[in-house]
Amino acid sequence: MTEALSWVLTDTANRVYVEQCAITPASVGLPTAGGGWSVTKSRLQGGLSDGVDVVDINNGHLSFTVLLSRGMGLWKGVCGDCTIGWDSPARGPVNPMFVNLLEQGGLGWLKGFDECIVRCGLNSNGAPGMDRVLDNNGNLSEVMLNLHGYIANLPAKYVELKIIPGKRTKIVLVGVVEEARCFCPQYRLTTTYTTEIGSSRVDIRDEVENFADSPVEFQMLYHCNFGPPFLDAGARLVSPSLEVAPRDPRAAEDIKTWNVYKAPEPGYVEQGNYHDFAAAADGSTLSMLRNRRGTRGVTMRWNKKQ
């Protein structure tokens, strides 16, 4: 079997940076399979996207874009004739340099929010508000927490692309993002995207390391966002929910129809619910968003123990 091929696209420790490149079967001497595949690294130019580094991965059936400048988020994708993602007013991807996370009372995160899958965290992941932490002198101090934390607005310091030939050749993209400050928590997020040639699936593996010398708080939320063709009036969330609880009084208004999505409404105020999902003995579980007719659906799988 042909040995795995690898390319380092970014390595700040060794001053390595590749602005653009394209990898195809022909360029690396591999046979074309599954309709052909490609991986392209580029840097966007113009508007709020200026300077954003992206990697476009096409496995011959599924294609998706990973944002190296935005916490290794998954921006958008296409599978067959289905688009994957949503149409955000932010119209990104937005370079974090244009995002002030503390503006509008900590809601600045929304200015760059338009990924299909974006990570929230790592020190905090929820709504903006005040928190009490130890300062550099060991005294309790009040600080402002912004919406959904910092990790989605931090660039990868190390990025590596791997092609693993085999019966089902794999494309693997690894990125390392650090959220760290002196006298503050220090996190290292290592993200790995893996997809096989010709498949309709991408696996995402995240490892978070505390590289400080003392324990720290840790939170992470996967903010997953889908529009048409999966989301339409009457679309349903299909999930093994043992218990569903409204997040607030607004969510409680429609708790009886928590799994059914309405048509777009001007001025709609979001409704969010908490779920306790049934899982297999090993902790694995899943959920699916399907359109009203049941002809299109997207499934997410994860492990409750992780």
List the model feature ranges, each with a label.
Residues 66, 207-212:
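Asparagine-centered strand-capping/turn motif at beta-strand->loop junctions
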Residues 210-213, 227-229:
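Short coil/turn motifs at secondary-structure junctions
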Residues 187, 222, 273-275:
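Aromatic side chains
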Residues 271-276, 281:
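Surface beta-strand/loop "capping" patches
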Residues 77-78, 214-221:
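Short, hydrophobic/aromatic beta-strand segments
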Residues 1-197, 201-203, 226-234, 239-263, ...:
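Surface-exposed acidic/polar loop and edge beta-strand patches at domain peripheries
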Residues 206-207, 224:
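Generic detector of well-ordered alpha-helical packing
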